[in-house]
Amino acid sequence: MMKMRWLSAAVMLTLYTSSSWAFSIDDVAKQAQSLAGKGYEAPKSNLPSVFRDMKYADYQQIQFNHDKAYWNNLKTPFKLEFYHQGMYFDTPVKINEVTATAVKRIKYSPDYFTFGDVRHDKDTVKDLGFAGFKVLYPINSKDKNDEIVSMLGASYFRVIGAGQVYGLSARGLAIDTALPSGEEFPRFKEFWIERPKPTDKRLTIYALLDSPRATGAYKFVVMPGRDTVVDVQSKIYLRDKVGKLGVAPLTSMFLFGPNQPSPANNYRPELHDSNGLSIHAGNGEWIWRPLNNPKHLAVSSFSMENPQGFGLLQRGRDFSRFEDLDDRYDLRPSAWVTPKGEWGKGSVELVEIPTNDETNDNIVAYWTPDQLPEPGKEMNFKYTITFSRDEDKLHAPDNAWVQQTRRSTGDVKQSNLIRQPDGTIAFVVDFTGAEMKKLPEDTPVTAQTSIGDNGEIVESTVRYNPVTKGWRLVMRVKVKDAKKTTEMRAALVNADQTLSETWSYQLPANE
């Protein structure tokens, strides 16, 4: 009897011990809250000049030795590899492993890397740190680990699903984006990564965010698959007042496309990581905003309460739309943010920045709350980000969606059948969708259109498109002042029934 009591006590002690210690976002939040109450300490670079001053081609020579991947000798589907410091990745981040019983720092060693032709003194790099890390997982085939997550630089991270290649990025937080005061880029200064079990299909990552005016604690649960979904929880604390807080920011690139053709001859018809901002507003409306590469900074704001979702999408997957064998823009994912709970009043904001080439991310989208708490008070945001190539499920299932937007010189067909430019700009917008395809060809589909004070709609026509089994809107617009932007909206209806999402377009200035 005494032996049974002793065994019971031992079992209870074991259960208590294993359940009483568990790392959580609250452990990170304590650090973030403590940091918020102190003055900001800028990170110090410990990088030798040979690495700090190197060119990108040299930095690319520094490769992680795949044979030394972290967890390589463990029966887990996830593996970790690390980024070396170099160029503007000049400050180290701390990376920790979380097990069932402890937290252990993953120490830097130059032995993890091959340096190619980069000459360096081993003694000068022995005490460096990592610039970031990547996660590998057998997402495309069971016998091969492929990279699915990259966390490198500021609070940026990139994620892909099966059959995808890296494109747009997500971020932890954006501060004062597009404001005259200049943008502040918070950075993840420390990570904690839970060691996965052999049967785990998800990976949990915690991160501590820091910047001059904000700190934060983050929990990312990565669920790889055909679509890779990242479940995000954040606790944010302001050190000082900010002009604008960008929550769940997405960063992408748009250089040119059919709504804004390339000014120079280019064999690629389109060049972009994303071609539109999609919004599912709190009132149920779906909005599609084609992206631009403007000549001047452009900011668009969509006010609403409790957004149901937003994302930067890559609509149109045919290779013929891109014709790029090297960069495979047709395989780059869309990213869709789904808020959890009520986010209150605020705006989905789109920032479009001029760029001359595809190496610059010039598109940013995020949620910005109308009201921010006083410094030190906690803000909580929960959401998922879905990285997908299946855009069919990223719009209203019962409404038509915009398949493409094309811009052209407006013209009128003369009696001799020759088209004569009439000083207008023509927009050709194709709508399609599963429900729309069921409509008879003679359905009296019309368009509800509107334009801002800087323009006039000269003509608007809708006709059936037998190729897409949808309807095509052609709208000819006259701009009053080319130095100003021109806003326009359109949606397809049948009597009092709305058939499509709302096409919302901004014609940039000086176009």
UniProtKB/Swiss-Prot annotation:
Q: Where in the cell is it found?
A: Periplasm
Put simply, this protein is called: Glucans biosynthesis protein G
Give a short account of what the protein does: Involved in the biosynthesis of osmoregulated periplasmic glucans (OPGs).
User: What cellular component GO annotations does this protein have?
Assistant: outer membrane-bounded periplasmic space
Checking Gene3D superfamilies in the record gives: 2.70.98.10, Immunoglobulins
The leader peptide range reads 1-22
Keyword field: Periplasm, Signal
Q: Enumerate the Pfam families for this protein.
A: MdoG
* Entry keyword 4Fe-4S: no
- Record's family? Belongs to the OpgD/OpgG family.
